[in-house]
Design a protein with these regions (language model features):
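Extended, low-complexity, amphipathic alpha-helical coiled-coil/linker regions that act as scaffolds
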Residues: 1-190
């Protein structure tokens, strides 16, 4: 199980780097780019491990990431604002589903939503993107989020020497059933 977790963390790190590179050229707020590459990538990888890369849940989570990117784009027309407000509950539900899937802490959720809410409010005031620009951004987001997730076969063998900290440390998270299998107990139970 621990070797599996190590491989999962290495895959997660690779996918995070992949998404960061793919999302970098997109005109998106940095907190959204960071959230998708660092947090949402974990939800996508976890769902893919549980259900397979082409599962309905993975497709739904990819779509939610695309909708998140598009949700903060300016909406100048009343029809655009109305469509956004109609889609918002579904987006929030899917974001919460993904965050719950990886056990993202409540405090981090509050911080993220504290940034997202003003971005959504600001998007309702701005000058709408031209249709061409909107469609181009949507395609770029689809392309970035549609890239294949890394596979364990693509990973180089683990380093036998002492690892060098190059990036943020991705905190390993164990599902309740995994924690039980390796003998971990919940802090509240101690």
């Amino acid at each position: 199980l621990l070797a599996e977790k190590e491989t999962d963390l290495r895959l997660q790190q690779r996918y995070t780097q992949q998404l960061q590179a793919l999302l970098k050229p997109l005109p998106v707020a940095e907190f959204i780019r960071d959230f998708i590459s660092q947090v949402w990538s974990q939800a996508l990888m976890h769902a893919a491990r549980l259900d397979g890369d082409d599962s309905a849940r993975v497709k739904r989570l990819r779509h939610a990431a695309r909708e998140l990117i598009m949700s903060v784009q300016p909406k100048g027309l009343p029809e655009q604002r109305k469509a956004f407000l109609m889609q918002l509950p579904t987006l929030m539900k899917e974001l919460n589903e993904g965050m719950d899937l990886i056990g993202w802490p409540e405090s981090a959720k509050k911080t993220f939503f504290g940034l997202l809410l003003p971005a959504h409010a600001e998007s309702l005031k701005g000058q709408a993107l031209r249709t061409l620009d909107y469609n181009l951004l949507a395609r770029q987001a689809d392309s970035a989020l549609g890239e294949a997730m890394p596979d364990a076969a693509e990973l180089p063998p683990p380093q036998a020497n002492i690892p060098v900290l190059r990036d943020e440390v991705i905190e390993p998270r164990f599902a309740a059933e995994e924690a039980q299998r390796i003998g971990l107990v919940d802090e509240a139970a101690v």
